[in-house]
């Protein structure tokens, strides 16, 4: 299965609580933090919810 490299590109200041929780569930903390996750429907759904805050690359 493919892996996704997810980078938090925008700050969470002023963002609604559900978006903050989604970013936290992805394992991202500060701006420009990077995580590598398996590509599955659950992760894709979370990325869709915060697509305006993150940058995604396939590894």
Curated annotation (Swiss-Prot):
SUPFAM superfamilies hit by this protein: Ribosomal protein L30p/L7e (SSF55129)
Name of the protein: Large ribosomal subunit protein uL30
Cellular component, GO annotation: cytosolic large ribosomal subunit
Coiled coil ranges: none
BP GO terms, sorted: translation
Assembly, per entry: Part of the 50S ribosomal subunit.
Domain of life of the native organism: Bacteria
Organism: Listeria welshimeri serovar 6b (strain ATCC 35897 / DSM 20650 / CCUG 15529 / CIP 8149 / NCTC 11857 / SLCC 5334 / V8)
One Pfam family matching this protein: Ribosomal_L30
InterPro entries for the chain: Ribo_uL30_ferredoxin-like_sf, Ribosomal_uL30_bac-type, Ribosomal_uL30_CS, Ribosomal_uL30_ferredoxin-like
Record key words, sorted: Ribonucleoprotein, Ribosomal protein
Gene Ontology molecular-function annotations: structural constituent of ribosome
Family that this chain belongs to: Belongs to the universal ribosomal protein uL30 family.
UniProt xrefs under Gene3D superfamilies: Ribosomal protein L30, ferredoxin-like fold domain (3.30.1390.20)
């Amino acid at each position: 299965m493919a892996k996704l490299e997810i980078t938090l590109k925008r700050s969470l200041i002023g963002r609604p609580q559900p978006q903050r929780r989604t970013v936290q569930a992805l394992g991202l903390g500060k701006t420009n933090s990077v995580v590598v996750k398996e590509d599955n429907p659950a992760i894709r759904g979370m990325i869709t919810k915060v697509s305006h805050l993150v940058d995604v690359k396939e590894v």
